[in-house]
Structure formats: C-alpha cells, structure tokens
C-alpha cells in the first residue's frame, strides 16, 4: 500500500481505527476536549515516525465531522497534526531507532498490537542492530529480544504452512500458544532436563511433526490446558512424552484432519475484488468448521489416555 494514494490511505486508516476501536474512541474524545497533547515525529519527506494513530484520528475528526455529528468549531483544533520534523540527512537506521524508542520503549507501547514488537525486532536486526541494542531501545532484556526473534521465526513457519507468508494479520490472538510452543520445541531440540521423562528417543523429524500438529491446533484457536497436553514439558509431560500415545495421536490426526478446500491463489482468482484479509479469515473459519470435530475428539481421547499414564507413574 502507498500512503500517498487516497485509496490506499483510506485502507490504512480504516485498519488503524478498526484494530483498536474502543481505545480510538477514548483518544478521539481526548482530542476533541484537549487537542493534541503530544507532538508526533515526521521525516523531512512527510513519513510519520511516531503518531500514526493520532494523525489518523485527527483526520477522521476533522474531515468526517459532518458524518460524526460535529461542527467545524468543535473540531477546528484537529485540523493539523503537530509534529517535530527530522533533518534531511536522517538515515533509515536512525529513523527506525528513534521510532522504536518512542513507540516501544515507553509505557504506551501497550497500545500496539502484540505482533508488532516481533516485527520491529526483525526490522531492527535487518538494519544491523544487535539484540543488546534492540533491548536498550525497547527497555527490555537481551534474552527477551532473542526469545521474540525465535517466536517470530516460528510464527513465520506457521504462515508459510498455510500459504499466508507475510500476512501477519492471521496471527491475531495467537501469541500465547506460539510462545508456549517455541519453549517446548526448544526444550525437545536441546534435550533439556525438563524433557528427561520422555520415554523414547524422538528424532528431529518427530519434532517437526509435533510442530505441524500444533500449528493446526493454533489455527483452530486452541490454547490453555488443552493445547499444552499435546507438547508440554516438565514432570507431568504431555502426549509427546509417550511414544505409543504420540504415534497413535499423530496417525489419527494425519488421517482425519481435512485440508483446505481451496488454495489462497484459487481464492484470489475467484474473488479478485475481495479484501484479502476477509478471504483468508473466511478460509480459516471454513477449515475450522470442518476440522473442529476431529481435532477436539482426537485430543480429548488422548488427553484421557495421558491422564491414565500420569496416574500410573505416580
């Protein structure tokens, strides 16, 4: 999308507004009452470094005032976005550093989508910043930055698995299971002490199978105890700890879990004018509807068998 084109700008502003409707309504009330209280930051060519959401809300209040029921006098203070302009010689690396410090290193970083911190780490690494540098910008520990980068790698594997590469909106409300899964997979790969009770010598291929099975359950929006029963580490273990349970569970999963009726490319060709995010959400929902009975039934059966294993080991 090109923010300089009116059509693309409208799409971007709609996305920003819809992503945090309640929060945006509260901010709009504040802007109406008090005006803009904090300056934004803008590059010399007009790119907003800090303040995209506020700029969008100011535009919305001023240019949609009649639709929203406000008079010119009520929204006059919203006519302009007040900002500090960066010098002409500011480089991309400098801009990204400044943007991160302002957006992710302050208390209001909670305003941002959880996935954004992962993408910001990736971008800063691309620009050559170390994990220690990024940690300083974000007021985090280097170990946290390393974990976020690893979790994003896992998220991107997930997107590739379903032909959603680069479409990060499909990760909405999945952060928790991905964080858990990354920790589980890391423990299995490194054979840490928290997997010593596993009763078989699993291979890298088995770990890969585990990852793909968990991807299907994440896609179906499983989390909490049900999700943890598949791969959890620690003294209580999980289905993956027991060779007989895992192989039977995996077989049932592979045989009975349906595949998508259409590829992403087929959907794009069939509905060329439809919003891609809507198409993909519909695709996921249709798959969930067809798969949820099998996923739920298989997991419940083997969770009961897992409880029996745990009881017999006590």
Protein language model annotation of sequence segments:
Residues 217-246:
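Eukaryote-biased activation of long, low-complexity terminal tails and linkers
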Residues 244-313:
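Charged/polar low-complexity intrinsically disordered segments, enriched in acidic residues
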Residues 53-70, 202-208, 212-223:
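Short active-site loop/helix that positions an aromatic residue
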Residues 1-73:
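Short, charged/polar connector segments at secondary-structure boundaries
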Residues 15-16, 73-160:
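Amphipathic, charge-rich alpha-helical segments that serve as recognition/docking helices
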Residues 1-23, 137-143, 147-186:
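N-terminal leader or domain-start segments enriched in small/polar residues
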Residues 178-201:
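A short, Lys/Arg-enriched interface patch at domain edges and termini
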């Amino acid at each position: 999308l090109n923010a300089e084109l009116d059509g693309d700008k409208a799409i971007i502003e709609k996305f920003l507004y819809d992503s945090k409707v309640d929060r945006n309504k509260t901010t709009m009330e504040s802007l109406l009452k008090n005006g803009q209280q904090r300056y934004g930051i803008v590059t010399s060519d007009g790119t907003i470094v800090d303040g995209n959401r506020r700029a969008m809300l100011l535009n919305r209040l001023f240019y949609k005032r009649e639709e929203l029921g406000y008079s010119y006098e009520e929204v006059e203070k919203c006519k302009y976005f007040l900002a500090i302009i960066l010098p002409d010689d500011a480089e991309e690396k400098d801009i990204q550093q400044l943007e991160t410090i302002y957006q992710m290193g302050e208390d209001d970083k909670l305003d941002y989508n959880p996935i954004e911190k992962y993408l910001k780490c990736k971008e800063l690494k691309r620009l050559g910043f170390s994990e220690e540098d990024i940690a300083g910008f974000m007021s985090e520990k280097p170990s946290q930055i390393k974990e976020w980068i690893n979790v994003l790698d896992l998220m991107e594997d997930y997107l590739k698995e379903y032909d959603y590469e680069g479409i990060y909106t499909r990760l909405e409300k999945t952060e928790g299971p991905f964080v858990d899964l990354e920790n589980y997979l890391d423990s299995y790969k490194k054979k840490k002490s928290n997997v010593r009770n596993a009763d078989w010598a699993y291979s890298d291929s088995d770990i890969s199978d585990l990852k793909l099975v968990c991807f299907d359950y994440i896609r179906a929006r499983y989390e909490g105890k049900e999700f943890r029963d598949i791969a959890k580490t620690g003294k209580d273990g999980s289905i993956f700890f027991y060779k007989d349970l895992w192989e039977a569970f995996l077989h049932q999963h592979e045989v009975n879990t349906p595949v998508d009726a259409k590829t992403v490319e087929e959907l794009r060709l069939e509905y060329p004018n439809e919003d891609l995010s809507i198409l993909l959400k519909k695709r996921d929902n249709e798959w969930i509807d067809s798969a949820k009975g099998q996923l739920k039934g298989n997991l419940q059966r083997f969770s009961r068998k897992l409880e029996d294993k745990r009881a017999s080991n006590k």
